């Protein structure tokens, strides 16, 4: 399998942060998005950003900005589709997605995805981590390995009104790549001002 392309999902509307782009918030002198790029870029062949609105606000990243092709802010699956369409233009077979507000995700994200999806005709996998208290396994719908071969199926599902990521991935027998929780959940994301304070504390401690 060719090395996947990377797509950072930044299409959310950040309502709990008062609007704006969570990825552009400062985290120890750099934007959260910069932290995400630095973790994802070494693991993939190239990186693009899924975001809506004026792409100029991301100009410092020097990344291609891919808007949703489905109207109405339908959620992460629209960003996945935008990434798959971009990947098809690049001649790639798969993409790996990461969320723009999740700065501490695993540095072995892509290898673990490829391992989990080994042998699948259309490699498809979601990340997961286990709740430290309850032991429940939580899938992470914005962190996934997605095959270009299923992009037309995804487009049709979105046009039919499907919005929930796991409904679509379950239809196609997605694998699960489980990542350990070592001190903090690696998929901790910044949704509120309080989360940002926690993220700054984690970053200061060298996560």
Question: Where are the model-predicted features located?
Answer:
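Nucleotide and nucleotide-moiety/phosphate-recognizing core
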Residues: 1-165, 170-186, 193-207
């Amino acid at each position: 399998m060719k090395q996947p392309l990377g797509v950072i999902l930044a299409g959310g509307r950040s309502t709990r942060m008062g609007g704006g782009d969570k990825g552009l918030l400062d985290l120890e002198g750099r934007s959260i998005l910069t932290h995400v790029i630095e973790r994802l870029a070494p693991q993939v062949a190239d990186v693009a950003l899924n975001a809506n609105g004026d792409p100029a606000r991301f100009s410092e990243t020097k990344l291609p900005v891919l808007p949703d092709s489905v109207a109405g802010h339908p959620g992460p699956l629209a960003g996945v589709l935008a990434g798959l369409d971009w990947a098809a233009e690049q001649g790639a077979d798969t993409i790996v997605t990461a969320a723009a507000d999740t700065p501490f995700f695993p540095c072995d994200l892509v290898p673990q995805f490829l391992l989990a999806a080994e042998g699948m005709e259309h490699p498809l996998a979601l990340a997961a981590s286990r709740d430290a208290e309850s032991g429940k396994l939580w899938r992470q719908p914005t962190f996934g390995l997605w095959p270009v071969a299923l992009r037309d199926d995804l487009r049709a599902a979105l046009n039919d009104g499907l919005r929930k990521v796991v409904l679509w991935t379950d239809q196609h027998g997605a694998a699960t790549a489980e990542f350990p929780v070592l001190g903090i959940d690696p998929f901790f994301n910044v949704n509120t001002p309080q989360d940002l304070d926690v993220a700054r504390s984690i970053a200061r401690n060298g996560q």
